[in-house]
Amino acid sequence: MHILVVSVNYRTAPVEFREKLTFQAAELERAMTTLQNQKSVLENVIVSTCNRTEIYAVVDQLHTGRYYIKKFLADWFQLEIEEVAPYLTIFEQDGAIDHLFRVTCGLDSMVVGETQILGQIKDSFLEAQQVKATGTIFNELFKQVITLAKRAHSETTIGESAMSVSYAAVELGKKIFGELTDCHVLILGAGKMGELALQNLYGSGARKVTVMNRTLSKAEIMAEKYMGHAKPLSELQCALLEADILISSTGASDYVITKEMMTKVEKMRSGRPLFMVDIAVPRDIDPAIDELEGSFLYDIDDLQGVVEANRAERLKEAEKIQFMIEEEIVLFKTWLSTLGVVPLISALRDKALAIQSETMESLERKIPNLSDRERKVISKHTKSIINQLLKDPILVAKEIAAEEGADEKLALFAKIFDLEMEDVESRAEEVEHKRVWTPSVPSL
């Protein structure tokens, strides 16, 4: 079995391509179920955010797994593999494990050290568990990753100076306007990104804020928290006439603001400029709007320069976290290496218990007048003897499994205890394809 990551992210692809490979939240479970039925794929988790779409998979063959995951991406988004391939980065084995740790800890984010990705990884993992797309390996790996990411943020100061993408959008507005007190700000979208932007706007002195959302009640709840006003999305054109700054993050699949709409609005704004920051992927605002004279459009990739603040300080903390990651990878690989010895240990235990059971039957035939209490006491103590005898051999087997040339040594181990290899191999196949649903993960 092999661990594989296929990634398209802000480093490898511009936003105009990333938006073509973005899974909507409502379709994520169906996507993981579909991927689970692809050839070679044994387990999978799909993570799709504004800055990355990544497929984490356990596959039986690396070459076959790579091909069918790329084919799945191309087919799902109705593209050719040749269109998708140049923008993909593929991580395998140790590189894949390290990448998952780094992403979850915020070390691979545009904003180094941000914590939002931790929640996104956790949510994706839980969704994958719901549709039984994870198994023995990913259930262990993702729980270990989430636990470490939480510890990394509590034991270092990397998150203290990190800014979110929403914060960066507000900072860009401040660079352009200076004080935001007299600016009319329009927020499109009442999700997490929109609320973070509104929270940062309020902290920067903005008080003339309008929130718009397809579901008006969500906009009203969010606006009320920060002394803003809520309006239905049907009044968007009128709201654009009043705004000085627009921050948009709706999660819509099509443009919410088109060039045609903005052309009409500009004619009624009497030359007043409108600064628009689109932090949605797929984008909410037609990029062609940037061609208009009075509209100044920035997308999520344009925020790179803004988020560089305090980067050197955060990179020092990132080095500490990378060391923690390397320690965790060693622990995970040790666990992974012992996974293959589980069927051998299981066969050894079963053989020992079979001997104990036969011994108890023989004893009961020879001493038929045993009371129930006496039978239980004898059974308990004979099982205790077995456990004591097996303790050291099992520990040795686990140590051997982590060594080079383990297969030959474990074969000798099986021969010493006269274990049937066909039975061991059958158990190994069961472990390999086992789906274990363990929904409890560390809280954030």
Curated annotation (Swiss-Prot):
Catalysed reaction equations from the record: (S)-4-amino-5-oxopentanoate + tRNA(Glu) + NADP(+) = L-glutamyl-tRNA(Glu) + NADPH + H(+)
Gene3D superfamilies in alphabetical order: Glutamyl-tRNA reductase, N-terminal domain (3.30.460.30), NAD(P)-binding Rossmann-like Domain (3.40.50.720)
Any single biological process term in GO: protoporphyrinogen IX biosynthetic process
Record: residues binding substrate: T49, C50, N51, R52, S109, E114, T115, Q116, Q120
NADP among keywords: yes
Record: active site: C50 (nucleophile)
Site (Important for activity): H99
Key words of the record: NADP, Oxidoreductase, Porphyrin biosynthesis
CDD domains: NAD_bind_Glutamyl_tRNA_reduct
GO molecular function, one term: NADP binding
Annotated pathway: Porphyrin-containing compound metabolism; protoporphyrin-IX biosynthesis; 5-aminolevulinate from L-glutamyl-tRNA(Glu): step 1/2
Known EC number: 1.2.1.70
Pfam families: GlutR_dimer (PF00745), GlutR_N (PF05201), Shikimate_DH (PF01488)
Residue sites binding NADP(+) per the record: G189, A190, G191, K192, M193, G194
InterPro entries (UniProt xref): 4pyrrol_synth_GluRdtase (IPR000343), 4pyrrol_synth_GluRdtase_dimer (IPR015896), 4pyrrol_synth_GluRdtase_N (IPR015895), GluRdtase_CS (IPR018214), GluRdtase_dimer_dom_sf (IPR036453), GluRdtase_N_sf (IPR036343), NAD(P)-bd_dom_sf (IPR036291), Shikm_DH/Glu-tRNA_Rdtase (IPR006151)
Additional remark text: During catalysis, the active site Cys acts as a nucleophile attacking the alpha-carbonyl group of tRNA-bound glutamate with the formation of a thioester intermediate between enzyme and glutamate, and the concomitant release of tRNA(Glu). The thioester intermediate is finally reduced by direct hydride transfer from NADPH, to form the product GSA.
Function, in words: Catalyzes the NADPH-dependent reduction of glutamyl-tRNA(Glu) to glutamate 1-semialdehyde (GSA).
Description of its domains: Possesses an unusual extended V-shaped dimeric structure with each monomer consisting of three distinct domains arranged along a curved 'spinal' alpha-helix. The N-terminal catalytic domain specifically recognizes the glutamate moiety of the substrate. The second domain is the NADPH-binding domain, and the third C-terminal domain is responsible for dimerization.
Subunit: Homodimer.
Similarity field: Belongs to the glutamyl-tRNA reductase family.
HAMAP family in the record: Glu_tRNA_reductase
Protein name: Glutamyl-tRNA reductase
